[in-house]
Amino acid sequence: MVQGSSDKMVQSSRVESFEDLNVYKQARDLTNKIYEITRQVSFSKDHGLVDQIRRASVSIMSNIAEGFERGTNAEFIQFLYIAKGSCVEVRAQLTIAFDQKYIDENTYKNFVEQCRRISGMLGNLITYLKSSRFKGSKFKRPPTKSMAEELNEILQQIKHEKENK
């Protein structure tokens, strides 16, 4: 799946689980960085903001994961939109942290850029899923057997029935 050509957004290998998605990896990185900055003495004292920004960053990861496992593109897309909303929430809370001087301008700009990148990746994934003919794993058809395989199974059943008589 191709999500874009810049910022390592290209999904080069087959996606087997949500952990394989580049956007999930970026969200995980963001969450780890959010936990790191909220441990700083000045930031850590604002318990309400620390709780909110951590929850919002965790929500990005969680919604990508939960949506992926739902089994339909429609449900996955719904959860990706929620993840996008959480991404914007993190940006708003970063602005509060910057305004309160819990983080410096460079840190603020780097975090905001990472949030925008993640939001863009989510948007690209949503666009891809909306245009995909594949509607999700719930709609996968089981692999069809060749006529030779079916005949072989029938012959095996007949043989088994004769042996048991």
Name the predicted role of every residue range.
Residues 1-165:
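Amphipathic alpha-helical assembly/interaction segments
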